[in-house]
Every structure is written in structure tokens, then in C-alpha cells.
Amino acid sequence: MTSQLEKEAREWIEETLHTKLNAQLDLLDQLQSGVILCRICKEALGANIRYKESNMPFVQMENISAFINYAQQVVHVPSQDMFQTSDLFERRNDEQVLRSIHSFSRYAAKMFPGKVRGLGPKLAEKKPRVFSAQQQREFREGVNSLQYGSFDMPTQGTEKIAFSRRRDPTGNMY
């Protein structure tokens, strides 16, 4: 499963940046500096995101953190869909990183249509059902409790169910 996610993520990144990534290296090793992720935001989505190419660990973690902040605050990717900096930098949870890239692509495609394509299923849109007072009244009048029963939740008292005999604290049984 992870190899399929990685393949799709690699293709999406290459398509988005119009650049080929090194096929000999692992995708997550190439993303570890955070530069490629920030370039996606800056070049493809036009973000004003600052990043620096460096081999210093704290700079790389800042780049990753900048991507995560942009994804959550601007693209509105839910926090449960995003990875944490240590998941990528320390390679703690590779699958979560790949799933986050997929999720980021979907939310970015929704927010910036035509700039990037989304990976995986299309995001659903809320379509709340609004009923008029007349429709609600017709529904209430049309329900026959003899046919459908009661809409109240059953309880032990209403269903006359006893899971044990009643006990007296002195030990007597009823």
C-alpha cells in the first residue's frame, strides 16, 4: 500500500513542479529537507512561503513546519490529515506523510481549481437539507405511531427488562 501511495505522490509532485525527481532516491529522503514541499506551495499555488535550502537540521525542520502551517491555515487541510514534523524528518510515520500529501493535493485542488489535481477521491461538499415549516408539519402529521412505533428510546423501565433481581443492602433477595 505504501509503495502505491509513494508512486502516486511522486508522480503528483513531478507533475505539479514540472520537474523530475531523482528516481534512484527514496521520495521521503528527497522531501526530508522540506524544500520540495515549500516549492509546491510557492511555485504551483503562488504562496508567499519562505524556505531555505540547507543541510542544517533545524532549518529543514522549519521548512517542513512552514509547509504544514501553510497546508492547515491557507489550504485548510484538517489537522488529523496532516503529518507532524518528526514524522517526516525522523521518518517516524512514512505512511502518514504520504497520506498527508494526498490529502493536501485534494484540498489544494478544491481551493485552487486548475492549478493542481487532487489525488484519490474527490472531497465531498456539504449539502444541508432544509425543510420548510410546512414540510415538517406534513411529516409529523403523516406519522402513525401504531404503524411505526414510538420514536422514544427504549429503557429498562419501559421494556420491563431486569438484568438481575433487586437486592437489599442487608443481603436479602426480593
UniProtKB/Swiss-Prot annotation:
Keywords assigned: Cytoplasm
Transmembrane region(s): none
Cellular localization per UniProt: Cytoplasm
Matches recorded under PANTHER family: CALPONIN, TRANSGELIN
Name of this protein: Transgelin
The keyword Cell division belongs to this UniProt entry's keyword annotation: no
Main subcellular location of this protein, as a coarse class: cytoplasm
Protein role: Has actin-binding and actin-bundling activity and is a component of the actin patch. Stabilizes actin filaments against disassembly. Cross-links F-actin and is required for the formation of the contractile F-actin ring.
Pfam families: CH
Gene3D superfamilies assigned to the protein according to its UniProt record, in alphabetical order: Calponin-like domain (1.10.418.10)
SMART domains (alphabetical): CH
Statement: the UniProt record of this protein carries the keyword Cytoplasm: yes
CC terms in the record's Gene Ontology section: actin cortical patch; cell division site; cell tip; cytosol; nucleus
Gene Ontology molecular function: any one: actin filament binding
Domain Calponin-homology (CH) intervals: 3-109
InterPro entries assigned to the protein according to its UniProt record, in alphabetical order: Calponin-like (IPR050606), CH_dom (IPR001715), CH_dom_sf (IPR036872), SM22_calponin (IPR003096)
UniProt subunit comment: Binds to actin.
A biological process term (GO) from this entry: actin cytoskeleton organization
SUPFAM superfamilies noted in UniProt: Calponin-homology domain, CH-domain
